[in-house]
Amino acid sequence: MAKYNEKELADTSKFLSFVLRHKPEAIGIVLDREGWADIDKLILCAQKAGKRLTRALLDTVVATSDKKRFSYSSDGRCIRAVQGHSTSQVAISFAEKTPPQFLYHGTASRFLDEIKKQGLIAGERHYVHLSADEATARKVGARHGSPVILTVKAQEMAKRGLPFWQAENGVWLTSTVAVEFLEW
């Protein structure tokens, strides 16, 4: 594997998140309903947009991503963001899964008043993202300011017929979490 510095890997990961989750049209690519993009087309369009992207750099980002944000298709010709989409081009069909008793959501303290009113909503994303452990939720919350960890009564939600899914990188997904299912 070629050597790249941390900044180059982080910048490339952010770029891939932007085009594979939110704005594929920004560089002129189209994602299929499951979020897949042709790798050759992605590289070509990224280069035309002034981004230094090669297959070797892509391979390194996919292989070293601590959160496993991206995956390759079984034939190695396509790539997608595992979850976190806001683009209407994508509607990944995750298999429904029974959650553990509790899941966790990391957020910043400045969002608490709104969450106490409306619960957790997906906002611009397709799903609310939840973590299986508090440590991961804390890291997520810290990205947005002083972190607060909310406990989600996931099994109670599931018993009431509210569905959960789990992305291939372990992130739990649900449509919304009402205030009654949150512990502060």
UniProtKB/Swiss-Prot annotation:
GO biological process: tRNA processing; tRNA splicing, via endonucleolytic cleavage and ligation
First-level EC class: transferase
Family to which the UniProt record says this protein belongs: Belongs to the KptA/TPT1 family.
Listed InterPro entries: Ptrans_KptA/Tpt1 (IPR002745), RNA_2'-PTrans_C (IPR042081), RNA_2'-PTrans_KptA (IPR022928), RNA_2'-PTrans_N (IPR042080)
Protein's gene: kptA
Superkingdom, natural source: Bacteria
Lineage of the organism: Bacteria, Pseudomonadati, Pseudomonadota, Gammaproteobacteria, Enterobacterales
Protein name: RNA 2'-phosphotransferase
EC number: 2.7.1.-
Organism listed in the record: Escherichia coli (strain K12)
GO molecular function terms listed in the Swiss-Prot or TrEMBL record: NAD+ poly-ADP-ribosyltransferase activity; transferase activity, transferring phosphorus-containing groups; tRNA 2'-phosphotransferase activity
Function, in words: Removes the 2'-phosphate from RNA via an intermediate in which the phosphate is ADP-ribosylated by NAD followed by a presumed transesterification to release the RNA and generate ADP-ribose 1''-2''-cyclic phosphate (APPR>P). May function as an ADP-ribosylase.
Residues annotated as signal peptide: none
Keywords noted in UniProt: NAD, Transferase
